[in-house]
Amino acid sequence: MKHLMSLIIYAACCLSAAVMADDVDDPRGKMAPWEKGAWETGQYRNVFLEAGYKQEDIDAKLAKAYYDLFEGPNRVYFEVGEDMAYVSDLKNKDARTEGLSYGMMAAVQLDKKEVFDRLWRWTVKYMQHQDGPREGYFAWSVNPETGRKNSQGSASDGEFFFVTALLFASNRWGNDTGIDYYAQARRILDAMWSKDGTAGVRNIINTEHKM
């Protein structure tokens, strides 16, 4: 479900049109790339702030994008019971690993732990294979009304985004608040490079080329 990430990116890009201030000059060519990344420096670059936008305008735009996607009348996020939720591909009337994993990535970056945990619990229950040749992998499409898998196979971008989001969550919230995020991420990673071809299920990560 690529619509969620596309909308998030679109919302960020719309800052240039929606909150353009009269005193913000065209920033192109004025912002030199950093010599070191955030992983090394511990500082995450806010290019909109560097470009001259006000922090309150940036925050308001992000809050509006989150509201539209997760809370508003046209949301794609739906809660199930007391502790689960899924992201719907409204057009195709299913839930997909791309949508769930993108939703988790948005939740962890915006410090929405309850939303993150709800999405992950639904994912584990209805998408993740718990045994057999596909153990650790995810069914890429599920009917959210019945919980039945539309396809047993995986779409690797979902696996990669699940791992990334879980590692982010481990770093942000720790692993002793109800879900061991690191252990969950490690389980997926271990599955991604340990398949032996049984039933045609193969590694997602190429162990020879580390890709």
Regions found by a protein language model. Name each.
Residues A17-A21:
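Boundary at the C-terminal end of the N-terminal hydrophobic targeting segment
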Residues L167-M211:
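Aromatic- and glycine-enriched pocket-lining scaffold segments that form the walls
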Residues D22-E98, Q109-P144, K149, G200-N203, ...:
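Low-complexity, Ser/Thr/Pro/Gly-enriched N-terminal "stalk/linker" regions
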Residues G103, V115-F116, G178, A185:
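Solenoid-repeat scaffolds in large eukaryotic assemblies
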Residues K93-G103, K149-W173:
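Aromatic-rich carbohydrate-recognition surfaces in CAZymes
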Residues S6-S16:
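Bacterial N-terminal signal peptides
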Residues M1-L4:
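Positively charged n-region of N-terminal signal peptides that target proteins for export
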